[in-house]
Amino acid sequence: EGFQLMDRGTFDEIGR
């Protein structure tokens, strides 16, 4: 994961 700021499902596709 790349973005662990908000939900792991929200930025899942962005911080893949």
Curated annotation (Swiss-Prot):
Q: Does the keyword Calcium apply?
A: yes
Q: Where is the signal peptide?
A: none
Key words of the record: Allergen, Calcium, Motor protein, Muscle protein, Myosin, Phosphoprotein, Repeat
Look up the record and report any one GO term of the cellular component aspect: myosin complex
Q: What else is known?
A: This chain binds calcium.
Q: How does it assemble?
A: Myosin is a hexamer of 2 heavy chains and 4 light chains.
Name of the protein this chain belongs to: Myosin light chain
- Whose protein is this, by species? Penaeus monodon
